[in-house]
Design a protein with these regions (language model features):
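Hydrophobic anchor residue at the start of the ABC signature
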Residues: 74
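Conserved ABC ATPase "signature" region
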Residues: 27, 31, 38-56
Length: 235
C-alpha cells in the first residue's frame, strides 16, 4: 500500500468511465487511495488546470476528443501525487497538436521532480522526453544510454536522402554505396550516412548521378532504432 501510494500508472488504453463526468472520474479514482474528499477536490482543481481541462469538468467523458481523454487519463494517474509515473504509449493515436501539448505537460512533470518511465514506439517522443532510454528488439536490450549518446555511437552526424527516377536506383546502387561510410538502398531512395552532407552531395554529383530530390538532415534516434532492429516488419 505504501509503494502504491507513490506510484501512478497511465495505461495505453484510456479506460475511463465514459458515463461519468471528468470531475467524477477523478473523484472516484482518488477515493481508491482513501484520500479525504477535500484533498481530492483541491487536487482535481490543480490537475484540471495542469492538463488544460478546467472548462470540461462537468462534461461526460464520451464527449471528449481523443487528446482530451488522454490528458484526463494522465491527470487520473497523478491524483495521488506519485513520485513515479509509468506511461504506456502515452501519445499513440493522437494528432501532432495533441501530442505536443501532452509532451509539454510531461516535461513539466519532470521539472517538478516526478520520475517518468515511458514505453513508446515514437522515437521523436523518446528523444524529447527521455534522459536515458533502452532500445529493445525481440525482448532483448540492444542499446542503452542517453538519446544523444546513442545517436553519436550508432549514427554519423548527418543523413542525406537521394531520390531517383523509377528504375534508376537499381542500376546505380553499387556506385551509390561507395560514396559514404554507410548507406542504405531502399525501394524509393538511397540513404547515405555521413559526417559531412555537403561533401557527400558533391561526391554524388561528381559521379554524374542526377537525383530528382536531395534532402540533408541530422541523424535522429529513429535512424539508430532502424539500424539496431532492422527495417523488416515483425510481429
Amino acid at each position: 500500500p505504501q509503494l502504491r501510494s507513490k506510484l501512478g500508472v497511465v495505461p495505453q488504453e484510456d479506460n475511463l468511465d465514459e458515463e461519468l463526468t471528468v470531475y467524477d472520474n477523478l473523484m472516484m479514482y482518488g477515493r481508491y487511495f482513501d484520500l479525504p474528499r477535500a484533498v481530492i477536490k483541491e487536487r482535481i482543481e490543480e490537475l484540471l488546470e495542469f492538463v488544460q481541462l478546467t472548462d470540461k469538468s462537468k462534461s461526460k467523458v464520451d464527449a471528449l476528443s481523443g487528446g482530451m481523454k488522454r490528458r484526463l487519463t494522465i491527470a487520473r494517474g497523478l491524483i495521488n501525487e506519485p513520485d513515479l509515473l509509468i506511461l504506456d504509449e502515452p501519445t499513440t493515436g493522437l494528432d501532432p497538436q495533441a501530442r505536443h501539448i501532452l509532451w509539454d505537460r510531461l516535461y513539466r512533470l519532470k521539472q517538478q521532480g516526478v520520475t517518468l518511465i515511458i514505453t513508446t514506439h515514437y522515437m521523436d517522443e523518446a528523444e524529447q522526453l527521455c534522459d536515458r532510454l533502452v532500445i529493445m528488439d525481440k525482448a532483448k536490450i540492444v542499446a542503452e544510454g542517453s538519446p544523444r549518446s546513442l545517436i553519436e555511437e550508432y549514427a554519423p552526424r548527418e543523413v542525406v536522402e537521394f531520390r531517383f527516377p523509377p528504375g534508376v536506383l537499381e542500376q546505380i546502387a553499387e556506385r551509390i554505396e561507395g560514396l559514404a561510410p554507410r548507406s542504405e538502398i531502399l525501394a524509393d531512395r538511397a540513404l547515405l550516412y555521413t559526417d559531412d552532407a555537403e561533401e557527400t552531395i558533391s561526391r554524388v554529383t561528381a559521379e554524374g548521378l542526377e537525383p530528382e530530390t536531395v534532402l540533408a538532415r541530422r541523424s535522429s534516434l529513429e535512424d539508430v532504432f532502424l539500424r539496431l532492429t532492422g527495417r523488416t516488419l515483425v510481429d
